[in-house]
Design a protein with these regions (language model features):
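Short glycine/Trp-rich loop-beta-loop segment that forms part of the substrate-binding cleft
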Residues: 6, 24-46
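C-terminal recognition in membrane/secretory proteostasis and scaffolding
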Residues: 12, 30, 95, 125-257
């Protein structure tokens, strides 16, 4: 079973003679912490290659596609084409991520010290759904969102650039039912700070349908708290029909949540 939006899949193998790896908690990773990558760069003749590095950043998004669900661990352990799907371990031997991509200078496919791994906590969530249902069911708010820039921050009386601006509220959506309005700026979900629109997308989609979710937002310069009951996130084709926007306008305005 596969989940293209997260770039993850679950396969069934014969377990005879195999032991399972210990799964860590990627939420406990810190910038500067040592990690170890294992994979097969440039083909199977280099299989079981082990490299080491440190966590450079956490919560990276919009690396591969704004339409995907991304919350990457950025690290500098050497990974290259062929490492995708390989393990990222902490120094306790716990699996904390799945290596999936690298950033390059645009001229070479070789490692430049900027690698990205899917955090194991996201992997667990996707894995559980794929095994039980064959698909991933994500929470849905029913809004169109965009990042906060300097001009919008001034216009909406914000103290900083954190958060995500509501540019559209879908009719009869969970957001509308909860009282979310256009030009609200969501700054936290269940007490977790929202950095930008991609971060909000991840926080909402990591919830389950029917979850009671607390939103902290700024409206007319004042902080307000709302509780929303998440819906079931539609498929991409259904989303396109629901939001009634062409792709060109969608690219300008931001993300669907």
């Amino acid at each position: 079973a596969t989940d293209p939006p997260s770039d993850l899949a679950v396969i069934k193998v014969d377990p005879n003679g195999l032991s399972t790896v210990a799964l860590g908690n990627s939420d406990q990773l810190s910038v500067g912490e040592w990690v170890v990558a294992i994979g097969s760069p440039f083909g199977l003749h280099l299989n079981h290659t082990v490299t080491a590095g440190i966590v450079s950043a956490i919560g990276r998004s919009s690396v591969m596609s704004r339409n995907n669900f991304e919350d990457f661990i950025q690290h500098d352990a050497a990974i290259n084409p062929g490492n995708s799907g390989g393990a990222l371990f902490n120094l306790d031997g716990e699996l904390v991520g799945i290596n999936t991509a690298i950033a390059t200078d645009g001229y070479s496919r070789a490692n430049a010290g900027v690698g990205f791994a899917i955090p194991i906590n996201m992997v667990k969530r996707v894995m559980e759904d794929l095994i039980s249902d064959g698909k991933v069911t994500r929470g849905w708010l029913g809004v169109q969102i965009q990042d906060v820039d300097e001009g919008m921050a001034k216009a909406l009386q914000l103290n900083g650039w954190n958060g995500a601006i509501i540019s559209q509220v879908i009719k009869n959506s969970p957001a509308e039912d909860a009282g979310v309005e256009k030009q609200d700026v969501i700054i936290a979900v269940n007490g977790v700070k929202v950095d930008d629109s991609s971060n909000l997308k991840n926080l909402i989609s990591s919830g389950r349908p029917h979850d009671k979710t607390k939103l902290t937002l700024i409206r007319d310069g004042h902080e307000k708290k709302l509780t929303v009951t998440l819906g079931i996130r539609p498929g991409e084709k259904e989303l396109a029909e629901t939001y009634r926007y062409g792709e060109k306008l969608f690219d300008i305005l931001g993300l669907r949540v």
